[in-house]
Structure formats: C-alpha cells, structure tokens
Amino acid sequence: MEPALKKMADPLNGAELPYDVSDEYRPEPVPIPAPPAWQDGSFRIGIHTSIAGDIAGALDIAAKLGANALQIFSASPRMWPGGSSRIADADAARFRGRRAGLGLGPLVIHDNYLINLASPERVMRTRSIQAFHDELVRAASLGADFLVAHPGAGLGAEMSQAIEDIAQGMRQAARGMKLGGLRILVENTSGMGSAVGSRFEEIKAILDQTTDLPMGVCLDTAHTFEAGYDITTEEGLEKTLDAVDPTVGLDRVYVLHVNDSKTPLGSRVDRHENIGEGHIGRKSFGRLLNHPRLGPGPQGLAGRAFILETPIDKPGDDRRNVRALWELVGIGVKQAPKAEEGFSMTRAEKKPFARSAEKTQKKKVSGGKSKGKARKGKKKVKTRI
C-alpha cells in the first residue's frame, strides 16, 4: 500500500497540495573536482630535492635535473622543531605559484625521520603526533598531493598494538583538519629492527583502521627487495604484485620510490644505491617501470609517480639517475624534460677543459709556486709568466 502523503497549503491560493516528506531537503549534487593538471596519464619521474636555503628553490632543482615531479622535506627531517614550524603564507603562496609555472607534479612530501607513531613511550608518542600534525599543516599549505609517512617501530610492543597506535596517531594528528587534495601514503619498510610495514599485510591493517582519512601507499623498491620480495626476475615481480593487490591494492599505490639496493635480497637493512649499481639492477627497473600494472593508467589516479631517493656519491649522479629512468621507459632525451647540462644538487659538474683552465688560473695567481707557506722573514720572489 502506498504511504499516505501529507497535505500542505498552496501559498498562492490556499488549496491543499500533496506533500512527500522526502521533498523536505534535496541537497545540490556536489561537483566532482577536476583532477590536478599533472594527472594526464603521462609518466611522472621525480627526485627528492633539497630545500636548503629556500624551499621554493627545490622546484627549480627538480626542473634543472630533468624531472617533472619531486619530493621534498617540508622542514629539517632529523630535528624536532624548537618552535613554530609553520610555513609563512607568503612563502607558501610563492611556492605554489612557482610550481604551477614549472608544471611539476605530483608534489610529494616525506615526513620527519624522528616521528614514531608506534612508540609505546608516552613522551615520544605525544611528540610524534604533534610533529605529524605539523607535517600535515605544512603539506596542505604548500598544496602537496601526497605526504609519505614511515609507519614507525613498536620497540617491543606486539605488532597488532603497534599498528593500532599508528592508525590512532594518524587520526588524532589529522583531527579537525581540512586536508584538501592531500593524501597520506604509508611507505613499506625493509624490516629493520621492530619497524612496522615490511609485510604488505601490516600496511593493509593500518589502512583498514584509517578509513576516515584519505590514505594510500608508497612502494619503495629497495625496501621491498630488502624485506625479501624478489623483484629482480619476471616471475618474482609478478609474485610481488600478486601479494600487493589483495592486501593494500595496486589501485592505492600512488607513488613508487625507485631505488636500487646496496644490500642483498632479504637483508632487512635499508641502504639505497644508484640505479643499476646495486643488487636489483638496471634490467629489473626497466621491467618494473614498463609493467602494465604499475605504469601510468586509470587505476586510482590518472598516473603514478616514480620518485628517486638515490645517493649522490659524485656530482651529477642525481641528473644521471633521472635520465636513466627516462631511458628505461623508452622516452629519449628529446622527448623527456630538458635537464640543465652539468647541473647537480651538490655542485655543477666541471668539464675537463674547465678544470684545466682553473689550474692555469691558479698558477698565474700563485706564480707557479708550491702550496707550502713562505718562511717568515723571507721575501717571496714573484715569477713572471
């Protein structure tokens, strides 16, 4: 039987009109926000860049290295802030404007290394929650797309308790915040000590307890390999992806940290190496970057970002690693973003002829004399060149 409809008076003529309770409130449909400009399905290759001196300078560094994405720290990663660690509104606006001008994206921020949301020690836990809250505030002010977080270490606590503490800490840190388009990514770990997150099931448990937050996963190749997942063979990579999909879900892997490993398979020791110079090997990275289940596509976002966290043992290693990834995905120098020749985060590389010219200039200044100091009381004899 149809429910009886209420009657209401027509305000124009007083006649009674049928009235349905469901008509009381019909909210306007919420428009789906347009995706960021960088989500165009193209490859996004980035590198962790330095914020020393000027945080906006990190953007120029990424562009000069030939990257179209980047990762940064938003503050010192190995220090607790002594006071306010907020970024001034003017600086944040300048950063956002510069990033838009360079067309870089996504912007990934890595959290402070000292944060340990799994700590059973009360003071450390309180400090970590506050620091993670500050990370969220800074990331949102800079317009970041992702905040990558190390889960933490239980330091003797049961794994289930450590996971519960991590999830609760994240929720507490984000309470009352407007995160905008920011998504928190839990990074897998190598399994050193009591670190949480070396098994995908552990990361899934964190995600299952933070469903009220925008969450995702950052998959680190070195950590994956060091934790015992063999990604160096075609069969091993397939098995690893088969382990990821039913747990955290490949559709929630938004960022991959692309690092070779200085330590062997299953070492549980976190040591990054330059691409092709470690135990994973260049060929394995080519297979991984071109895998249809990991490459840019409509899974989750319009594309994934591949971010380098490789060491700079000599000037130019950073630029060479970026170029190596572009080569591995089959994008040549002409198609990839143009890198500035000789640029490095450490210092600009000097060409052989430049070093020779510098030595000649030093000889002219020193008169060709040795570096030893002249004896006191004796006058130096200048030699004509």
Show which residues each predicted segment covers:
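Acidic (Asp/Glu)-rich catalytic clusters
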Residues: 38, 60-67, 86-108, 135-143, ...
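Active-site acidic/histidine proton-transfer and metal-coordination neighborhood
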Residues: 53, 117-217
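Active-site beta-loop-alpha junctions enriched in small/polar residues
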Residues: 48-52, 75-77, 112-114, 152-154, ...
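N-terminal pre-domain/capping segments
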Residues: 1-111, 115, 119-134, 331, ...
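Conserved, mostly hydrophobic/aromatic
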Residues: 62, 110, 128, 139, ...
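A general structural detector for well-ordered alpha-helical segments in enzyme core domains, enriched
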Residues: 58-61, 91-98, 131, 135, ...
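Alpha-helix N-cap and loop-to-helix initiation/capping positions
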Residues: 83-91, 119-131, 157-168, 194-202, ...
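Histidine-acidic metal/acid-base catalytic patches
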Residues: 5, 10-11, 17, 23-28, ...
